[in-house]
Every structure is written in structure tokens, then in C-alpha cells.
Curated annotation (Swiss-Prot):
Lineage of origin: Eukaryota, Metazoa, Ecdysozoa, Nematoda, Chromadorea
Residue ranges, compositional bias (Polar residues): 451-464
Name of the protein in question: CREB-H transcription factor homolog let-607
Compartments in which it is found: Nucleus
Sorted UniProt keywords: Coiled coil, Developmental protein, DNA-binding, Nucleus, Transcription, Transcription regulation
Coiled coil: 295-350
PANTHER family, alphabetized: AGAP001464-PB, CREB-H TRANSCRIPTION FACTOR HOMOLOG LET-607
Gene: let-607
Amino acid sequence: MDQDFDLDEGAGQFNLKTTLMMFTSNDSQNDDGIWSPGSPYQALEDPSFLDKHFVSDPDRYTADELYSALEKMDGKSDLIGMDDMDNDNCYSLSPPDSGSLPISPASTSPSSYHSSGGEDLMDCYPSIDILQQASEELLYSKDDDYEICSSGPLLAYTNANSVATSAVHQNQQQQQRRLNQAGFPHQNSNGLVRFKSSQPRVLNPASISLNAPSSSFNPQSTSSTPATSSSSSSSTNGGFVKSSTGERRKYPPLRLDEEEIKLCKKEGICLPDFFPLTKAEERDLKRIRRKIRNKRSAQTSRKRKQDYIEQLEDRVSESTKENQALKQQIERLSSENQSVISQLKKLQAQLGQNAKRTTQAGRCLAVFMLSACLLVSPQLSPLGNQDNQKVLECIEEACQPSATSMNSANSAQRAIAGVTAPSVVIPSGGPVMVSTNANRQMNRNAVLNHHNNSKYPASGNQNHHPIALEDLNHPPPTLQPKQSYQQQHQPSMYRRSDETIAMAMAKIGARKGSSTSSSSASSVASSTSTSSATSPIYRTSRTLGAFEDQCDASSDDSNCANMPSLVPMKMSAQPPKRKIVTMNGQPRVTYRAVPASSVNVEQAQYYKVPQQKVQYVTMDRPIKYEVLQLNDYIKMEEESTIRLPNSWSTAGPRLHPQVNASSRTVRPLTVATPVHYNGPSAKKIKTQMF
């Protein structure tokens, strides 16, 4: 009911009939057939109605009295037959909006709900749960009882917009008809909630505003009425809600614990006892519960830390006690260790004194026994005194220098006999002059020789041909054994000491004639001969003393009687020039020695070897030549005589043993006749500096 009414008490007088007609006209807007024939409102037109129910004097009626009279009439159903007709009262839940349709049949607001026409009155209407209202409308039944609609106060006058308001209601009814024709279920008009009164309508006189302005509308009083009706329609005991359709719906209760209730009171948050909750209430409830969870988590964390600290304290106390016990044990062990060390030192001192005494006695005994052994050992030697004396004399003779003497008469025989041995010694100074004692053989060889043989007389005496160290004439050819080319050892200027001792021992053994000495001497001689066969042994002498090894090795001293004495070597101040025979020169005659066992007297055998061309070489130092020949013997000649340095003069000691020529006998020597040999032989010469 959007019409505004007001009871105007102008000077305490008003027209009773006119006022009643105004009340009835307000209801006539909702029902077009209220003034139709047979309607109860037609009784107002009867003049006896006022006389019957109201006093004709209008002064005695005030607004309150008139209202109470109308209530009595309403209770008696005299004015309107409540038992015979349905009185439907409605009020709008939304501002009126012409020409709008609801969004859906369950909607309670038009599509243009937020249009410009209704935004000014939004605060005048309460917020209603749309889902709840839709469920109530869907479950709507005409036969159900309706609750009393506590509408706003009825105003006693109609404002200037009453005509426009009736037009709005007509439009709403037309919209409802169109919805019904479109197939939507039966619903109330948009924005309207219908209530059917099950009890007589009771109006509170205090709610009627008599001093309200005639042209004003109070939205606050209007908005409070729907809120009250909404709360009364939805709040019941036990969380049950009875809707307008009479359906009882139960919502779960909101259960809060003591901490949540306490925190809500502390923060001033009021929450309902049952669901549903608004978004703000849900937000507050979540915040409260989050605070409670954080509080409990913090308490748990603090408790865990406290437990950990207590455990650490217990461990510290236990460790402290254990440390104290270990300290006491260490002190006790250190004292025991000191006592044990002192005892050990005393024991070591006592043992050291005893050990020194025993070692001194042992050392003295060992020295005494060693000295006794040294004194007794010479007497136990297997060698006799004479043998030792002979060895010493032989060594002394080997160290004495030999006097310069001419060659003996039998030196040539020893030289020729020595050629048969496999070892040949080549002097370092010049060629060895060889002479034969066979006069006939020498004369025959001299006739066949193409060279100048006047130098070689028929006499076999070696004294006719003394060795001239500075003679520049060509000496007779040197007989050298045929050797194969192989690696040679370094030549030595002097005889080695071990060879000298071996010779002396061999000599001593030969003189004694013992089998042991003879075997040792022969073994030494054989080893010397074998070694000399592989490599020539160089001596410092220019004479035939090179063959003394064979003489010394023999068991008979008579064969060594004609051994010539050793001749010292001399060197000139000028550098020597040596002649090396090559194959490019004219052939010359050389001789080859043949062993006596293979000599046939009837058929003379000797070989003629072509000589080589002489090549002059100037050297600054003495040179030793090592001659290697594969097939035959060669001859080496000297341009000038080599002189040794002053340190090598005759005054210096000689390592060769002194040979007694008188004790030597002539050795038999057989020399074959020379035979012409025309085949060239391959020769190799190796020069070595020293």
C-alpha cells in the first residue's frame, strides 16, 4: 500500500463519512470490484449506517475513538465480511519500476533493479535472501495459511500521486498476466510478497502518525516494517524456519568453542547462533580461528624449544660430572706414570753399569786373540823362506834398468824361432832387424833379392850388423806374422806388473824343476802365447827382446843363452817421420817364416810379398802402430830414429827383467828358402795416438 493517508483534525472537526470513504477507497485500489453490486462497502452509502454505528455528533469522536470503533466493527465483521472474502494485503519489496520484467520466475527484483529510478530508495528496503525467497515462491500454495502482514501505518489522506500509484499497480498486474500466459508458474507480482491473515487484523494505534506532514514520506518507518516482518517470519526456535508456504527448514547451528567465544567478545564480534552467515561474518570467523591456530602453533613451538633446552641442560650436567671424574682419573694416572718412570730410570742405570763391565772384558779378550793369531800366522805359511827370497830377488831384478849392449850372435836365431810363435810384437820406434845364423841360407836369399844385398854379408855374426839407432839406411825386411783383422786392445809401453810376477814365478819353478812350478809356468806361458796370438803386445825395446816370454816359459835355460840384451829407446828433438808401405809402390821382397816341422830341405819354400808405396806422415808425438793383415806379413820402415824423452832415458828404471845372456844357449832355427809369391794381399793399417 503505497497510498499515504492522514487524519487531519482541523479544529477537532472532520467529516466522518468522508474519512470512512477514504479508508475504503484505499482498499479499492487493490480490488477493482470492491464497489460492485453486492459488495460490503456499499453499506457506507446507506445513511442509516452512520447513525447505527457512529454518533452523529462529530465533536465527540477523535482519531483514537474513530480507530477503536473501526476495530470493533472489523472484529464483528460488520463492515467487511471476513469469513466470506479474502483480504489480500501486499507491500512492495523493491521500488516501483514501470515497464520492467523479472529476470527469472525465482527473482524478486526486475531486470532494471539497479536503474537510476530505484537507486535512491535502496536503503529503505531490507536485504532478503534471494534463494530462500525463490524457494518459498516455487513452493507457493493458495490453500496454505498466510501470516499476518505487519504493514506500515495507514495514512488518512491520499496524496497527489495516488492516481500514478494506481497506474503502477495496474501495470504490475498486467505483467503477471503476461507471465502466466508465457507458461511461467503462478507467482505473485514482481517485488510483492503476499500474506494471508489467519487472525483478525489488529492495528496498533501508536504506529499511526498523526503529526506527519501531508506531502512527505518517511522511508525509515517504512523500511523498518519489512525488516521486522522478515525477522519474524524467519526466526523460530531450534533453528527451524517457517516460510510463507508453511515449510519448516532447519539450518545447522554455529558451534564455537570457549576460545572462539572469548576472542569474539574481546574483539566485539557478534555472530548468530545458526547458519547461514554473511560474508563479513564468515571473514571474521575465519580470522578468529586463524588467530587461535597461530596461538596454538606458537605454544607448541615454544614447548618444543623448552624441551630441547631442558635436554641440553641435562646433557651439560652429565658431561660436567663425567669431566670431573676423568680429571681425577688423569691425575691419578699421571702420578703413577711418574713413579714408574723413576723406577725405570733406576733400573736402566743399574743395567748399564753391568753391561759396561762385560763389554770391556770381551774387548780385551778379542784384541788379545787377534794379536796372537797375527803372530802365529807367518809360521804356518806353506811357502818356504827360500821361495820367498827368490820371489823377492826376481821382482828386484825386474825393476832394475838394463845396460846398453850389442846384440848377441844368436839373436837372429831367436828372432826367427820366435816368428813361429803366434804372438808377434811390433816395436813402437822402428822395424826389427832380423838376421839368420845360417850362412848358406842367407847367401842364397841375398842372391835372389833384387835389392841392395851388399849390406848383408855372408857372415852370420850379428856383430857385423850392429843396430844403428840413427842410421837412415833401410834395414833388412822385418818378418811379421800374418794376422787377421780384429778389435785390438790399447797397447802398453811397459810390461804389466802381473806379467812380470808371472814370469818370475815361472822362472823360479823352472830352476827348481818341480812338477808344480813347471805346470804353473807352462800354463802362464800358454796363456801368454794365446793372448798374444789374438792381439800383439808392444814392448819398449827395439831388439829381439820381445821374444823373451817364450824363453822364460821354456823349462830349459840353455835355449835362452843367445837372447840379446835390451836396448833403450831414444827420441830426437824433431818430430819423427814414419814410412807406411802401401800397395801403390813397386813390389819388394819380404820373408815369411815357416815352422820347422813343415820345412822340406829338398824343396825350399819361401814367399815373396810385394811391398807397398811409402807414405810420409809427420807427427808431433810418438805413435804406436797396430798392424792388421788378413793374408800375409808386411814390413814397416822408419825414416828417422825415434828418441824417447829425457824421462825415458837409460837412467830411469826399466820394468823389463834383467836377462843374463851367458846363461842362454843357442836355439835351433830352420828357415825355409824364399819363394816368389805374386798374389797381392789385402792389408789394413790402423794408427793410434797415445
